[in-house]
């Protein structure tokens, strides 16, 4: 099974929004169901290392269709995109080298979401893909005001978790055949989470490689000689697991 795209004639409203983070202009993207009454729980979405592209926007629309106010954040500023791994590596370097840099962009995205009358930022969650998964998990560990965080095939390195800072329930959706997230990193992550009795769930999807949620991953992997591939079954299963945690914690 595959995740159903939002129909063009649905009541989902979506638009690009400008906001500032650390003094830089960012071009985010919001989506929400105009038929929903009252304020909606917020889900911040962080893109892959390719940037806030149509894939990330489509996920925002799907989140909106579930009854959330979706805010796709722009972590590179000015809507920059990585056209190849070299550019993407340069755009993500400041975050991978200094994981503490992940906190402010998430806080700023939540603040901007709060400007919209449809958004209830007291019920905020976050999700991210690859690079984005790394970002949202580290931001949560640094104390971001999030109730639930979901990482899809994200790197599991970064800051050490501290019980007094981590407030979110965490879901890790990991591909069992992901060679870009070493087993040693997975073991270290679990050990760190267990050491503070963190509320987390770690799910491994059989046969899934890195970037398994992106329908373009197989083509990109072939183009750039990267060990990534789309896996429809894992994409669907992880989406269902994400839906459950957000419904349980945010609604």
Residue ranges and their predicted role:
Residues 165-170, 196-199:
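Short, proline-enriched alpha-helix->beta-strand connector loops that line the catalytic pocket
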């Amino acid at each position: 099974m595959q995740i159903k795209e939002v129909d063009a004639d649905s009541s989902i409203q979506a638009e690009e929004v400008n906001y500032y983070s650390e003094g830089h202009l960012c071009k985010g993207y919001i989506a929400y169901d105009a038929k929903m009454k009252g304020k909606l729980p917020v889900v911040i979405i962080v893109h892959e290392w390719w940037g806030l592209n149509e894939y990330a926007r489509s996920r925002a629309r799907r989140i909106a269709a579930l009854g959330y106010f979706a805010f796709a954040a722009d972590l590179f500023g000015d809507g920059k995109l990585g056209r190849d791994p070299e550019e993407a590596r340069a755009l993500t370097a400041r975050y991978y080298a200094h994981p503490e840099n992940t906190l402010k962009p998430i806080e700023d995205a939540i603040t901007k979401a709060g400007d919209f009358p449809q958004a209830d930022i007291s019920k905020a969650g976050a999700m991210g893909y690859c690079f984005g998964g790394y970002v949202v998990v580290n931001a949560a560990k640094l104390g971001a005001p999030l109730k639930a965080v979901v990482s899809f095939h994200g790197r599991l390195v970064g800051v050490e978790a501290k019980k007094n800072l981590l407030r979110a329930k965490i879901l890790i959706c990991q591909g069992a055949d992901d060679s870009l997230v070493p087993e040693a990193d997975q073991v270290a992550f679990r050990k760190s989470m267990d050491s503070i009795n963190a509320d987390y769930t770690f799910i491994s999807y059989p046969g899934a490689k890195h970037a398994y949620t992106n329908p373009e991953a197989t083509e990109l992997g072939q183009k750039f000689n990267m060990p990534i591939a789309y896996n429809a079954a894992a994409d669907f299963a992880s989406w269902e697991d994400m839906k459950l945690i957000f419904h349980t914690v945010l609604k």
